[in-house]
């Protein structure tokens, strides 16, 4: 037999447009980087953005709604399969990421030959420097393994391109 909920909603704290939430975060303050050395030696961090007007990490959540014979619905969230598309990567001579991508294309490499690390830096979240007298900036960041997979190569008269997918795997490790 259905029941009626007669409870009142009280003491609601509304946040959002009217709240004093601080300065809007500028897009360039969320930095996306790849290790262009693909785990071979010291990381060579390449920052996305030179030829991109937009980059998003699609979270691809694994969710399901289940309804039982009593008419109740449950929600199951099993995780994420994050990925991103860098669909306008123009090749620049001497660029270590271009050289790594061209190597993958030339060798039709797969699997761990395409594995590297991704770094996301929250440049709006500057931390106090631990070392006095230095001018270094310290920001919150996360590092995660990923696979970089070229989706095509070629392009038009505007330049040689190697667009690619980034498939993030494993857990993010938070640090500064």
Question: Which residues fall in each region the model found?
Answer:
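Short beta-strand and beta-hairpin "edge-sheet" elements
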Residues: 50, 122-174
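Short, cysteine-centered beta-strand-loop-beta hairpins and adjacent loop/turn segments enriched
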Residues: 91-98, 172-175
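Short N-terminal helix-initiation segments at or just after the protein's N-terminus
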Residues: 15-33, 98-111, 164-168
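Short, acidic/charged, Gly/Pro-enriched secondary-structure junctions
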Residues: 98-140
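Solvent-exposed edge beta-strands and adjacent loop segments
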Residues: 2-93, 143-158
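A broad "ordered helical/assembly scaffold" signature
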Residues: 58, 66-70, 102-108, 118, ...
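Context-gated lysine
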Residues: 28, 67, 109, 115, ...
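Broad gene-expression machinery/nucleic-acid interaction feature
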Residues: 83-85, 116-118, 161-163
């Amino acid at each position: 037999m259905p029941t009626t909920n007669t409870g009142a909603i009280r003491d609601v704290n509304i946040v959002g447009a009217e709240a004093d939430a601080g300065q809007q975060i500028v897009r360039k303050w969320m930095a996306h980087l790849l290790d262009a050395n693909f785990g071979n030696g010291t990381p060579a961090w390449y920052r996305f953005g030179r030829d991109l007007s937009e980059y998003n990490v699609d979270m691809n959540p694994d969710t399901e709604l289940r309804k039982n014979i009593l008419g109740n619905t449950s929600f199951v969230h099993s995780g994420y399969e994050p990925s991103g598309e860098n669909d306008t990567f123009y090749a620049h001579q001497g660029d270590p990421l271009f050289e790594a991508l061209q190597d993958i294309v030339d060798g039709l490499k797969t699997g761990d030959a395409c594995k590297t690390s991704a770094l996301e830096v929250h440049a709006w979240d500057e931390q106090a420097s631990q070392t006095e007298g230095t001018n270094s900036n310290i920001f919150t960041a996360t590092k995660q393994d990923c696979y970089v997979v070229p989706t095509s190569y070629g392009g038009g008269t505007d330049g040689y391109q190697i667009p690619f997918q980034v498939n993030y795997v494993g857990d993010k490790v938070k640090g500064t």
